[in-house]
């Protein structure tokens, strides 16, 4: 048993009769590990599961109090599925009966289950049906936070502080939907998220194809230039900004991108077309055309920043 299991929880994690609230975490990588650390820092008890025994043992040193399985699922206030989309769905299928047996979504009892996968349709299309059939609460989520690193060793309790969180609730009537969203936000308070956005799975995946997946593809492709081998001493902020996410987890990102292929292909076609216009202007030596293209991009970026400033989102 980890030492953390014996430590008294602070008041911030106290539940009924002063007992610590409990968070379950499936997958102790960067995201799952950061959820585990955030809840532990807030005084919650953390139960977890990871397929890698060494990772689980490392997490038990100071963060995780014990294992998450069918016997401990009923102890949880929230369960965070921080795994790839297929693994999230499989975990739900495997544990659906245990979740349903201890839950009454209308009364707000039993664990709230969320997933953190980077694509939502792949998970939510099945998860909503599983949760409805077995009678437990589920809400899709996507924390808009991360680093170029991966693994529990790089997780931190402050990763989500002030960062946006996207919520994707199931199709419910207005009252049930509001109750689920309020419950989700309340249970996520220890993580310190900033703005919450609510959307549907299709919209999430369409936008994330542009704001995240396209960025990773462009960054990853950019460093394949042979000139990259000579960048030392010639690069500064622009190079660093553009290449930060070239370093990624290929297996995880390939699954996310293939699951969102239609949206990502559209964005790739769009940027390839735009790049072609710059190339054609350069090849033709057309300074006026190139200046116009650059001015257009500058104007669009300024308008986007102004709009973000107006909403307090920059």
Regions found by a protein language model. Name each.
Residues 2-74, 78:
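NAD(P)+-binding Rossmann beta1-loop-alpha1 motif at the extreme N-terminus of oxidoreductases
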Residues 19-22, 110, 162:
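Phosphate-coordination loops involved in phosphoryl transfer and adenosine-cofactor binding
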Residues 70-108, 112:
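Rossmann-like NAD(P)-binding element
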Residues 82-84, 117, 169:
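Glycine-rich, N-terminal phosphate-binding loop of Rossmann-like dinucleotide-binding domains
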Residues 94-153:
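Rossmann-like NAD(P)(H) cofactor-binding subdomain of soluble oxidoreductases
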Residues 157-244:
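Internal alpha-helical scaffold of NAD(P)-dependent oxidoreductase catalytic cores
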Residues 230-301:
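Interdomain hinge/lid region at the active-site interface
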């Amino acid at each position: 048993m980890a030492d953390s299991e014996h430590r008294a929880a602070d008041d911030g994690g106290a539940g009924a009769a002063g007992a610590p609230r409990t968070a379950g975490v499936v997958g102790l990588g960067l995201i799952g590990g950061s959820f585990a650390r955030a809840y532990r820092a807030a005084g919650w008890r953390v139960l977890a599961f990871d397929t890698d025994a060494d990772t689980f043992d490392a997490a038990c040193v100071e963060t995780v109090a014990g294992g998450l399985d069918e016997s401990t699922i009923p102890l949880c206030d929230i369960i965070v599925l921080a795994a790839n989309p297929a693994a999230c769905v499989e975990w739900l299928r495997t544990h659906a009966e245990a979740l349903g047996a201890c839950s009454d979504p209308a009364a707000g009892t039993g664990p709230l289950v969320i997933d953190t996968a980077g694509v939502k349709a792949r998970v939510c299309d099945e998860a909503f049906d599983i949760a409805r059939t077995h009678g437990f609460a589920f809400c899709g989520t996507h924390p808009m936070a991360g680093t170029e690193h991966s693994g529990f060793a790089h997780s931190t309790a402050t990763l989500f502080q002030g960062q946006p969180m996207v919520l994707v609730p199931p199709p419910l009537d207005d009252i049930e939907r509001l109750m689920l969203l309020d419950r989700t936000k309340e249970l996520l308070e220890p993580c310190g998220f900033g703005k919450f956005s609510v959307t549907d799975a299709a919209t999430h995946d369409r936008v994330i194809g542009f704001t995240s997946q396209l960025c990773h593809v462009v960054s990853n492709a950019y460093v394949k230039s042979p000139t990259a081998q000579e960048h030392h001493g010639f690069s500064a902020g622009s190079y660093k900004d553009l290449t930060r996410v070239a370093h990624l987890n290929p297996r995880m990102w390939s699954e996310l991108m293939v699951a969102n292929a239609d949206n990502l292909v559209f964005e790739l076609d769009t940027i390839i077309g735009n790049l072609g216009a710059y190339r054609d202007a350069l090849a033709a030596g057309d300074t006026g055309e190139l200046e116009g293209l650059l001015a257009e991009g500058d104007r669009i970026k300024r308008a986007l920043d102004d709009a973000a400033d107006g909403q307090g989102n920059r």
